[in-house]
Protein backbone atom coordinates (compact mmCIF):
# COMPACT_ATOMS: atom_id res chain seq x y z
CA UNK A 1 0.00 0.00 0.00
CA UNK A 2 1.45 3.34 -1.07
CA UNK A 3 1.61 5.86 1.77
CA UNK A 4 1.26 9.62 1.42
CA UNK A 5 4.25 11.93 1.79
CA UNK A 6 2.82 13.35 5.03
CA UNK A 7 2.38 9.83 6.45
CA UNK A 8 5.95 8.87 5.59
CA UNK A 9 7.25 12.07 7.18
CA UNK A 10 5.23 11.36 10.34
CA UNK A 11 6.45 7.76 10.45
CA UNK A 12 10.06 8.97 10.33
CA UNK A 13 9.54 10.61 13.73
CA UNK A 14 8.94 7.20 15.32
CA UNK A 15 11.95 5.14 16.37
CA UNK A 16 11.08 1.52 15.57
CA UNK A 17 14.00 0.22 17.62
CA UNK A 18 12.48 1.29 20.95
CA UNK A 19 9.31 1.19 23.02
CA UNK A 20 7.85 4.48 24.23
CA UNK A 21 6.47 5.33 27.65
CA UNK A 22 2.73 6.13 27.71
CA UNK A 23 3.44 9.88 28.08
CA UNK A 24 5.89 9.85 25.16
CA UNK A 25 3.47 7.86 23.00
CA UNK A 26 0.60 10.28 23.64
CA UNK A 27 2.82 13.24 22.72
CA UNK A 28 3.96 11.51 19.53
CA UNK A 29 0.38 10.60 18.60
CA UNK A 30 -0.55 14.28 18.62
CA UNK A 31 2.61 15.30 16.74
CA UNK A 32 2.30 12.64 14.01
CA UNK A 33 -1.39 13.08 13.18
CA UNK A 34 -1.46 14.23 9.55
CA UNK A 35 -5.16 14.42 8.68
CA UNK A 36 -7.04 17.71 8.42
CA UNK A 37 -9.84 16.64 10.78
CA UNK A 38 -9.84 15.89 14.51
CA UNK A 39 -8.43 12.36 14.40
CA UNK A 40 -9.45 9.60 16.78
CA UNK A 41 -6.76 8.17 19.08
CA UNK A 42 -6.91 4.40 19.58
CA UNK A 43 -4.94 1.89 21.61
CA UNK A 44 -4.48 -1.65 20.28
CA UNK A 45 -3.28 -4.48 22.51
CA UNK A 46 -2.18 -8.03 21.79
CA UNK A 47 -3.13 -10.16 24.79
CA UNK A 48 -1.67 -13.48 25.87
CA UNK A 49 -5.04 -15.22 26.00
CA UNK A 50 -6.87 -17.85 23.97
CA UNK A 51 -10.34 -16.30 23.41
CA UNK A 52 -11.63 -19.63 22.08
CA UNK A 53 -11.63 -20.79 25.70
CA UNK A 54 -14.47 -19.36 27.78
CA UNK A 55 -12.25 -18.86 30.82
CA UNK A 56 -9.85 -16.66 28.83
CA UNK A 57 -12.36 -14.24 27.31
CA UNK A 58 -11.62 -10.58 28.09
CA UNK A 59 -14.68 -8.37 27.87
CA UNK A 60 -15.73 -5.32 29.83
CA UNK A 61 -16.41 -1.61 29.98
CA UNK A 62 -14.51 1.42 31.19
CA UNK A 63 -15.63 4.94 32.00
CA UNK A 64 -13.02 7.16 30.39
CA UNK A 65 -12.47 10.17 32.69
CA UNK A 66 -12.51 12.58 29.75
CA UNK A 67 -14.83 10.73 27.36
CA UNK A 68 -14.02 9.76 23.78
CA UNK A 69 -14.64 13.14 22.17
CA UNK A 70 -17.68 11.71 20.44
CA UNK A 71 -21.23 11.61 21.77
CA UNK A 72 -22.47 8.07 21.28
CA UNK A 73 -25.85 7.45 19.66
CA UNK A 74 -27.76 5.19 22.03
CA UNK A 75 -30.70 2.96 21.10
CA UNK A 76 -32.87 1.61 23.93
CA UNK A 77 -35.32 -1.27 23.88
CA UNK A 78 -37.86 -0.45 26.58
CA UNK A 79 -41.56 0.21 27.10
CA UNK A 80 -43.75 2.28 29.39
CA UNK A 81 -42.06 4.09 32.26
CA UNK A 82 -38.60 2.75 31.38
CA UNK A 83 -38.96 4.10 27.86
CA UNK A 84 -39.79 7.54 29.25
CA UNK A 85 -36.78 7.37 31.56
CA UNK A 86 -34.53 6.48 28.62
CA UNK A 87 -35.81 9.43 26.60
CA UNK A 88 -35.33 11.78 29.55
CA UNK A 89 -31.74 10.56 29.92
CA UNK A 90 -30.99 11.46 26.29
CA UNK A 91 -31.42 8.19 24.40
CA UNK A 92 -31.49 8.80 20.64
CA UNK A 93 -33.91 5.99 19.80
CA UNK A 94 -36.40 4.29 22.12
CA UNK A 95 -38.92 1.56 21.27
CA UNK A 96 -39.53 -2.17 21.12
CA UNK A 97 -41.12 -4.07 18.20
CA UNK A 98 -40.83 -1.03 15.93
CA UNK A 99 -37.05 -0.85 16.47
CA UNK A 100 -36.64 -4.60 15.99
CA UNK A 101 -38.31 -4.26 12.60
CA UNK A 102 -36.23 -1.21 11.61
CA UNK A 103 -32.98 -3.01 12.46
CA UNK A 104 -34.09 -6.09 10.52
CA UNK A 105 -34.62 -3.76 7.55
CA UNK A 106 -31.06 -2.44 7.79
CA UNK A 107 -31.17 0.45 10.28
CA UNK A 108 -27.82 0.65 12.11
CA UNK A 109 -27.37 4.37 12.76
CA UNK A 110 -26.37 3.97 16.42
CA UNK A 111 -23.29 3.18 18.51
CA UNK A 112 -24.67 1.36 21.57
CA UNK A 113 -27.75 -0.64 22.53
CA UNK A 114 -29.41 -0.84 25.95
CA UNK A 115 -32.37 -3.07 26.85
CA UNK A 116 -34.55 -3.92 29.81
CA UNK A 117 -34.43 -7.65 30.68
CA UNK A 118 -38.01 -8.26 29.49
CA UNK A 119 -37.04 -7.12 25.98
CA UNK A 120 -34.30 -9.70 25.44
CA UNK A 121 -36.73 -12.29 24.07
CA UNK A 122 -37.59 -9.92 21.23
CA UNK A 123 -34.01 -8.83 20.67
CA UNK A 124 -32.74 -12.41 20.40
CA UNK A 125 -33.68 -12.56 16.73
CA UNK A 126 -31.30 -9.63 16.09
CA UNK A 127 -28.27 -11.58 17.29
CA UNK A 128 -26.86 -12.14 13.81
CA UNK A 129 -27.05 -8.42 13.09
CA UNK A 130 -25.99 -6.89 16.40
CA UNK A 131 -23.60 -9.61 17.62
CA UNK A 132 -20.84 -9.29 14.99
CA UNK A 133 -20.89 -5.51 15.45
CA UNK A 134 -20.46 -5.73 19.21
CA UNK A 135 -23.87 -4.13 19.78
CA UNK A 136 -25.77 -6.96 21.45
CA UNK A 137 -26.92 -5.92 24.96
CA UNK A 138 -25.26 -7.91 27.73
CA UNK A 139 -25.80 -7.93 31.52
CA UNK A 140 -22.02 -8.15 32.07
CA UNK A 141 -21.50 -4.76 30.43
CA UNK A 142 -24.48 -3.12 32.09
CA UNK A 143 -26.48 -2.82 28.89
CA UNK A 144 -29.23 -5.21 30.00
CA UNK A 145 -30.70 -3.38 32.98
CA UNK A 146 -33.81 -1.90 34.51
CA UNK A 147 -31.88 1.30 35.21
CA UNK A 148 -31.88 2.42 31.59
CA UNK A 149 -31.40 6.07 32.56
CA UNK A 150 -28.04 5.34 34.21
CA UNK A 151 -26.94 3.13 31.33
CA UNK A 152 -27.71 5.86 28.80
CA UNK A 153 -26.00 8.54 30.93
CA UNK A 154 -22.89 6.38 31.37
CA UNK A 155 -22.56 5.71 27.65
CA UNK A 156 -23.16 9.35 26.74
CA UNK A 157 -20.58 10.33 29.35
CA UNK A 158 -17.76 8.27 27.86
CA UNK A 159 -18.32 4.66 28.91
CA UNK A 160 -16.91 2.36 26.25
CA UNK A 161 -17.19 -1.38 25.77
CA UNK A 162 -14.33 -3.62 24.67
CA UNK A 163 -13.89 -7.27 23.79
CA UNK A 164 -10.89 -9.30 22.71
CA UNK A 165 -11.21 -10.72 19.19
CA UNK A 166 -10.49 -14.33 18.21
CA UNK A 167 -6.84 -13.46 17.54
CA UNK A 168 -6.27 -12.00 21.01
CA UNK A 169 -6.40 -8.37 19.88
CA UNK A 170 -8.19 -5.59 21.72
CA UNK A 171 -8.99 -2.10 20.38
CA UNK A 172 -10.14 0.87 22.47
CA UNK A 173 -10.80 4.47 21.47
CA UNK A 174 -9.32 6.82 24.07
CA UNK A 175 -10.08 10.26 22.66
CA UNK A 176 -9.28 12.79 19.97
CA UNK A 177 -6.04 14.44 18.85
CA UNK A 178 -7.50 17.76 20.04
CA UNK A 179 -7.42 16.51 23.66
CA UNK A 180 -4.47 17.83 25.65
CA UNK A 181 -1.74 15.32 26.47
CA UNK A 182 -2.74 14.89 30.11
CA UNK A 183 -6.35 14.03 29.27
CA UNK A 184 -5.29 11.52 26.64
CA UNK A 185 -2.81 9.98 29.08
CA UNK A 186 -5.43 9.69 31.83
CA UNK A 187 -7.89 8.05 29.41
CA UNK A 188 -5.16 5.67 28.22
CA UNK A 189 -4.23 4.63 31.75
CA UNK A 190 -7.88 4.19 32.77
CA UNK A 191 -8.45 1.88 29.79
CA UNK A 192 -5.30 -0.17 30.40
CA UNK A 193 -5.98 -0.41 34.14
CA UNK A 194 -9.38 -1.97 33.46
CA UNK A 195 -7.91 -4.45 30.96
CA UNK A 196 -5.31 -5.43 33.57
CA UNK A 197 -8.01 -5.84 36.21
CA UNK A 198 -9.86 -8.28 33.96
CA UNK A 199 -6.89 -10.60 33.42
CA UNK A 200 -8.31 -14.15 33.36
CA UNK A 201 -6.87 -16.42 36.04
CA UNK A 202 -6.47 -19.10 33.36
CA UNK A 203 -4.19 -16.88 31.24
CA UNK A 204 -0.57 -18.03 31.40
CA UNK A 205 2.63 -16.14 30.62
CA UNK A 206 2.70 -12.48 29.62
CA UNK A 207 -0.77 -10.98 29.65
CA UNK A 208 -0.19 -7.80 27.64
CA UNK A 209 2.25 -8.76 24.90
CA UNK A 210 2.13 -5.68 22.72
CA UNK A 211 0.62 -2.18 22.78
CA UNK A 212 0.35 0.21 19.85
CA UNK A 213 -1.06 3.73 19.93
CA UNK A 214 -2.45 5.09 16.66
CA UNK A 215 -4.43 7.99 15.25
CA UNK A 216 -6.81 7.89 12.29
CA UNK A 217 -4.68 7.14 9.21
CA UNK A 218 -1.55 7.76 11.28
CA UNK A 219 1.50 5.55 11.96
CA UNK A 220 1.49 3.13 14.90
CA UNK A 221 3.53 4.02 17.97
CA UNK A 222 4.93 1.05 19.96
CA UNK A 223 4.33 1.46 23.70
CA UNK A 224 6.23 -0.29 26.48
CA UNK A 225 3.81 -2.72 28.24
CA UNK A 226 5.95 -2.72 31.41
CA UNK A 227 6.06 1.07 31.64
CA UNK A 228 2.33 1.11 30.96
CA UNK A 229 1.66 -1.37 33.75
CA UNK A 230 3.67 0.68 36.25
CA UNK A 231 2.04 3.95 35.18
CA UNK A 232 -1.43 2.42 35.47
CA UNK A 233 -0.66 1.22 39.02
CA UNK A 234 0.57 4.68 40.01
CA UNK A 235 -2.36 6.55 38.45
UniProtKB/Swiss-Prot annotation:
InterPro entries: Ribosom_uL1_bac-type (IPR005878), Ribosomal_uL1 (IPR002143), Ribosomal_uL1-like (IPR023674), Ribosomal_uL1/biogenesis (IPR028364), Ribosomal_uL1_3-a/b-sand (IPR016095), Ribosomal_uL1_CS (IPR023673). GO terms for molecular function: rRNA binding; structural constituent of ribosome; tRNA binding. SUPFAM superfamilies: Ribosomal protein L1. Pfam families: Ribosomal_L1. One of its GO terms (cellular component) is large ribosomal subunit. Keywords: Repressor, Ribonucleoprotein, Ribosomal protein, RNA-binding, rRNA-binding, Translation regulation, tRNA-binding. CDD domains: Ribosomal_L1. GO terms for biological process: regulation of translation; translation. Binds directly to 23S rRNA. The L1 stalk is quite mobile in the ribosome, and is involved in E site tRNA release. Part of the 50S ribosomal subunit. Belongs to the universal ribosomal protein uL1 family. This is Large ribosomal subunit protein uL1. It comes from Thermobifida fusca (strain YX). The gene is rplA.
Amino acid sequence: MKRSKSYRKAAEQIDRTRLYTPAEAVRLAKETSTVKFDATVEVAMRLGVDPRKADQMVRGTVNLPHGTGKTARVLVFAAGERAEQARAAGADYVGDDDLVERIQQGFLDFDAVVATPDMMGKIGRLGRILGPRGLMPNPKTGTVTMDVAKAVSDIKGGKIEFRVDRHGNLHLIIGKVSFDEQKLLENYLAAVDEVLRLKPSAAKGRYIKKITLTTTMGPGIPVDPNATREAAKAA
